[in-house]
A protein has these predicted regions:
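Catalytic nucleophile-elbow at a beta strand-turn-alpha helix junction centered on a G-D-S/GDSL motif
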Residues: 9-19
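N-terminal beta-loop-helix "entrance" segment that forms/cooperates
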Residues: 43-56
Length: 205
């Protein structure tokens, strides 16, 4: 059980994730005296889309060093699987189960931070979103379409995509068919794009 008055820094890749955490996750946890602070990787005007391994390591290690002497302070991440760049995961294609892939990457992240900082293992709790934050939009395609009334005419196409997969997190065949690409190919008037994602992330939930 998480102790009261806990502080958790969440390193995110872009503005959409930050807005999602501030609007959806943060209020829920604060009622239990768990205080969430999202911080954008690299710099606050970073647009997201790519997470370089060295940047991840630098930012997380810096945060760990700042909090290491303080009780009830922790660091986690929220990175899209397809946002990862140059992570040392050469053998990951041999892993078929998507959740095993997630565990594989998170273990590399944890081991890297522990080797660099020698902090207590519980200080850093890595998290990778499979495959993207946009995958969660397929949890309720009717609610997604309600945000933009012109999108209702695409609801059958979106539902067919959802029905083809075990869960929204399974929606993926390749880089060109990841959730964001599927939304870009289906939704028009207005067209779905990265700016739309930032607007939708806080309100669709």
């Amino acid at each position: 059980m998480t102790p009261p008055n806990t502080h958790i820094f969440i390193v995110v890749e872009g503005q959409s994730e930050k807005e999602f955490i501030n609007t959806v996750i943060k209020p829920t946890f604060e009622s239990n005296q768990i205080y969430i602070c999202p911080t954008i990787l690299g710099r606050n005007n970073h647009k997201g889309g790519h997470v370089q391994f060295d940047r991840f390591k630098r930012d997380v290690v810096s945060l760990i060093k700042q909090i290491d002497k303080q009780n009830n302070f922790f660091v986690t991440t929220m990175f899209d699987f397809y946002g990862l760049e140059d992570f040392p995961v050469q053998d990951i294609e041999q892993v078929n189960n998507i959740y095993k892939k997630e565990e594989y990457i998170e273990k590399i992240m944890l081991d890297t931070v522990l080797q660099t900082t020698q902090c207590h293992p519980e200080r850093f709790i890595p998290y990778i979103q499979l495959y993207e934050l946009e995958g969660l939009f397929f949890s309720d395609v009717e609610k997604l379409c309600s945000i933009q009334p012109n999108w209702y005419k695409f609801i059958s196409q979106l539902q067919n995509i959802r029905n083809d997969f075990e869960t929204p997190e399974h929606i993926n065949n390749s880089f060109d068919t990841k959730p964001s690409k599927r939304l870009e190919n289906v939704l028009f008037s207005p067209k779905y794009n990265s700016k739309t994602k930032t607007l939708l992330s806080p309100i669709i939930w």
